[in-house]
Each structure stands twice: as C-alpha cells, then as structure tokens.
C-alpha cells in the first residue's frame, strides 16, 4: 500500500470514528435528514414549474392535471402561482427541520467531545503533562473541537442536502432526456480527481494550522500566567514579538489554505460551466419536437446543478480540517491512562512507610534521579529530606502517591507495595502540600473542602483553618469563608495561600502527610504558628518533610541528606551536626545549597 493510500485509509477511519459521536443524537439527526430531503426535493419542482409557466404563456387556459379528479379544471393561469407558493412553503419547512435539528446535533457533539477530552486530561499520567505543551491541550478543547464539529455536522449537512439536490436533479434530467444527461455525467471523473487532489492539500495545511493555533494559545497562556515576571523583568517587548510571530505564522498558514481554495474553486466552476455550455449547444441543436417549456425546464434544472456540485466539492476542505483536528483529539483520547493494576483497598492505614532499594529514571531519559534509596518511617515519625536542588527530594515525594511509577525497588505502605493499592484508595491516605500552591477560582471554604472533601461540615472546615492559623486572616475578610480567592488565589498573599493549602491537608486527615517546602512562603510569625499546628497534626501520622529552613526540620526523628539521587547521610539533627559532614555544611549556610560532596 502506498503512503497516499495509507493516509486515505487512515482519514476514512478517523472520519467514521468521528461520526460515531453522532450516534447518541441519532433520533434528532434523522429528523434533520428528513428536513434536508424535503428541501432537496423542491429543486426539481422549481425547474418543473417553469415548464408549465412557459407553456402557459402560449396557452394560459390549458389545464395542469387533466386526468386527476377535482384538479382537472385547474388552469395553468391559476395553478402555477399557487404551486410556487406551496413549493416555497415546503422548502421552508425542510430548511427549518434540517438546520435546527442539525444545530442541536452539532452543539451536542461539541459538548460530548469537550467533556470527554477534559475527563481524559484528569486521568492522564504525569509524564504526559511533562512532555505536552499546555497551550496545545487547551487549543484542542477549544479550537480543534470546533473544526471537528464542522466536519461531523456542517459537512454532513452539505453532503446530504446538496447531495440529494444533485440526485433529484439528475433523476429529473434523466426522465426528461437521458441521452443529454449522460453527456453531463462525463465530467464527474474529472471533478473527482480535482476534489481528491485538493483534499490532500487541505488536510496537510489544516494540521499545520492547528499546531500554529496551539502555539498562539501557549504563548498567550504563559504570558498571562507569568504577567508579574514579564513586568518585573521588562519582558513586554519580548512577549509582544513572540506572540506576534506565533500569530503571524498562524495567519500565513490560514492564508495558504484560503489560497488553495481560491484557486481550486474557480477551476472547478470552469469545468462545470464548460459542460453546461456543451449541454446548451446540444439542447439547441437537437431540440427535436420538445416544447419551449421542456427546453427551459431542462436548462433550468441543469443550471441548478453547478451550485450544489461546487458546495459538495468545497466540503472536502471542511472535512479535511475536521479530520486533521480529530486526529490530534483522538491521539489524546488514545493515550494510556495512569496505570492502576492494584486491587487492595483499605479504609484506613496506620501510615507505616518503608522504602527499599528504590532507584528511578524519568521516562524517555537516561538520567538516574534516585539511586538505591532505603529508609523506613513508623506512624507518628517525621522524616526530613534535605539537600541541594536536583538531589531527588521532590521526585521521591512524587513517587509515594504514584504520580510517577517506579520499577526498581519497593515502596511499602503498611507492608503493602503501593502499586498493589487501587490508585484512588492509595491517594486517599496521603495529604500533600507543595511549595507552589494551587487554589481554584472559588470561595475559601470550597478551596479547603476540595474534591472528596466537598460537603464537609462548616465546623470542620473552620477547625482545619484554625489549626493552620488561617482563620485569623479569613475572619478579617468581608465575606469570611465565602470570599472568592480569584484565579489561583491571586487575591491572597503567598503566606495566606500556603496556609489554605495546609488547612486543606489538615481537613483531609490522612495518615501520611507530605510537606514539600510547605512553609517556605510564610513569614517568621506565620511559620511559628504553622509549626505549632504541624507538631499537633503530625502526632500519629507519618510525615515526610522537604524543607530549606532549619526550624522546619530540627525536630525531625530522622533527617535524610540527599545528593545526586543518593542518601549521603542520615540521623537526627544533633547526630548529623556531630558528624561535621555534608549536613553540617548545610547547617552552617542556613540550609542554602553548598557545593556537591567532594568539592573543595
């Protein structure tokens, strides 16, 4: 099979998969088809009525239906105007049914695709987000889905309505003069070749447009999210140029596709009207005993063909845009979800954590991030991880809730390998607070009682906020716990946002607590309050702390000093200071990043 044949087969498969999304709306879709059948049937009727109109010019008193009871007295003078009104009403009914119900199908399909895409995002593995541009992800949900909808509904509308129009007109023409009509059919192979050639170009250009649109979304998203950095470092000109380049690239690709259509459509029209010219010559040359009305009706019906044929040829552009968009959408929908082969579920674990000979490589890289890590933590113990950036602390913390899967070594929770737990059940037992706090554009109460915590009693929410020393600033807000925090908590200070994240973790009341630089954004007074709250909440819970501040880790039952993915020292704060090694140097520098072990 050649590359072009393979690509054509792939396009057909993608398109039929796309059409499968119409299935839930098949009842409404059938109503729209009925409407388009009604609409298409009126086209030969309009041509036919002209026959009687022209014949009526010479004999207006002739009857229209001489052999039909009750209508045999109806003269052309009366019948032609009446039939025109009836045909127009019939056409209007078909147009309404077709357009309205197809619009319902279209909007339903947009909704279904967007929801499925978004739901898929929620179950994709972390590595997918690490390697995929966020702007492209957003563009698929917004821009690509719209293009796909055009292929699945608007294109079908044209194919059905204009296709049936062509069929009905050809049937009418064959009934009037089949020999002349066969002459017209001779141009169809040429039209098919032209449509096929244009389709390949449209699909290729559509893919490029989608990538360019994703780049536009990505640049805009990055700039909006990082607007403080942009302004602080005078990056306005740089971002303006970057966005202008992305937008210009998208514009040029759009123009290239428009140019293809602008060249292709007139060429197709030239072919069709050339065939019409030949047909008119033959009609005049071979008129035989046909009446003037017959000739006018035939020419009119033939003259109605170019418009639907042209629209059918142009629908290729819409379909290829949709196929290109659907390809990227289905690629995302087909990505393997987070691996969850576990079968064990427990209502509550004690929090006994044990790591044995754990090594880890990030997917698709050769760089070893963790090397033969082993330690254990009993319930109620606090384990602190310290070391310079890139030493593997956060990676280790991300492996415990299975944000990434490990293959070398073991991580045991209550003596059970974490891969043997059902993923949702495992994460139910873990509360995590990161340095980069995520808050949603909702109320303070809803941000604390988020996800599985939604519906928690207000008293529990307020108690968690009080334990995190967040209630003191919440009570000062105009609407208290019902205050909107803005996008990602933009209306709150860094310390306030961090305290809300800690309150969320406290409300979860999980037996395993992971604090990844959780107090780094707090001022000294807030940190003192939080430390007191954490001392209370860590009782009976296993706590894994990653921190740069001495006050956060001095009380740890065990400190693991990490460098280059290995544990280079372990012990209590006092024991490690006595060793006068790597940790002692960290301590002397206030837990800033020293040079690596072995450096002079």
Curated annotation (Swiss-Prot):
GO terms for molecular function: ABC-type oligopeptide transporter activity; ATP binding; ATP hydrolysis activity; ATPase-coupled lipid transmembrane transporter activity. GO terms for cellular component: plasma membrane. Residues 30-321 form the ABC transmembrane type-1 domain. The chain crosses the membrane at residues 26-46, 82-102, 167-187, 266-286. InterPro entries: AAA+_ATPase (IPR003593), ABC1_TM_dom (IPR011527), ABC1_TM_sf (IPR036640), ABC_transporter-like_ATP-bd (IPR003439), ABC_transporter-like_CS (IPR017871), ABC_transpr_lipidA (IPR011917), P-loop_NTPase (IPR027417), Type_1_exporter (IPR039421). It is found in: Cell inner membrane. Homodimer. Involved in lipopolysaccharide (LPS) biosynthesis. Translocates lipid A-core from the inner to the outer leaflet of the inner membrane. Transmembrane domains (TMD) form a pore in the inner membrane and the ATP-binding domain (NBD) is responsible for energy generation. In MsbA the ATP-binding domain (NBD) and the transmembrane domain (TMD) are fused. This is ATP-dependent lipid A-core flippase. It comes from Pseudomonas savastanoi pv. phaseolicola (strain 1448A / Race 6).
